[in-house]
């Protein structure tokens, strides 16, 4: 239980994961320029950069950073900034939650994994989430064994009188 609390404290300290990788892409500077151009339409642009509820593993961090680079590049080329708020909301509400869960749940996480605190861009080892948290409603191996033993026992109990009757 204390490992879940430690994981929750760690996840609360995470911000703007997309800025930790590929410094040559200069995502924070590019996003700041786009936000300054969109100041009238989207007042909370720079506030939306913080992703305080997420932590990502190495592969997910690379995917999100590369995806954000490509989206910003398309916006810069086309000069169309109106899709920036919808991309940022999609990133926060859908993709980061998915990658965060993927990093902390089986099969990709076994025992513990390294997640990156994006406010410092340093990796920390955290324990994986239990299977019941990752897949609520699914049965774990112990419950499957109990169910299998119950079915076998019932079959034997019904089989013995059936054999005696025959």
Swiss-Prot record:
InterPro entries: TMEM95. It is a single-pass type I membrane protein. It is found in: Cytoplasmic vesicle, Secretory vesicle, Acrosome membrane. Residues 17-145 are extracellular. Detected in testis and brain with higher levels in brain than testis. GO terms for biological process: fusion of sperm to egg plasma membrane involved in single fertilization; single fertilization. Coiled coil: none annotated. N-glycosylated. The chain crosses the membrane at residues 146-165. The keyword Transport does not apply. It comes from the Eukaryota. Residues 1-16 form the signal peptide. Residues 166 are cytoplasmic. The keyword tRNA processing does not apply. GO terms for cellular component: acrosomal membrane; acrosomal vesicle; sperm plasma membrane. Glycans are attached at residue 117. Sperm protein required for fusion of sperm with the egg membrane during fertilization. Does not interact with sperm-egg fusion proteins IZUMO1 or IZUMO1R/JUNO. This is Sperm-egg fusion protein TMEM95. It comes from Bos taurus (Bovine). The gene is TMEM95.
């Amino acid at each position: 239980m204390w490992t879940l609390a430690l994981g929750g404290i760690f996840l609360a300290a995470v911000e703007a994961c997309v800025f930790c990788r590929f410094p040559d892409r200069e995502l924070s500077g590019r996003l700041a320029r786009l936000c300054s151009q969109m100041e009238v339409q989207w007042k909370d642009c720079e506030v939306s950069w913080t992703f305080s509820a997420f932590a990502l593993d190495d592969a997910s961090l690379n995917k999100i950073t590369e995806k954000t680079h490509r989206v910003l590049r398309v916006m810069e080329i086309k000069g169309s900034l109106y899709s920036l708020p919808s991309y940022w909301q999609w990133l926060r509400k859908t993709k980061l939650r998915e990658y965060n869960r993927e990093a902390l749940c089986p099969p990709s996480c076994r025992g513990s994994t390294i997640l990156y605190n994006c406010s410092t861009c340093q990796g920390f080892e955290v324990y994986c989430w239990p299977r019941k948290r990752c897949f609520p409603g699914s049965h774990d191996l112990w419950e499957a064994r109990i169910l299998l033993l119950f079915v076998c026992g019932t079959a034997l109990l019904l089989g013995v009188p059936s054999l005696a009757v025959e």
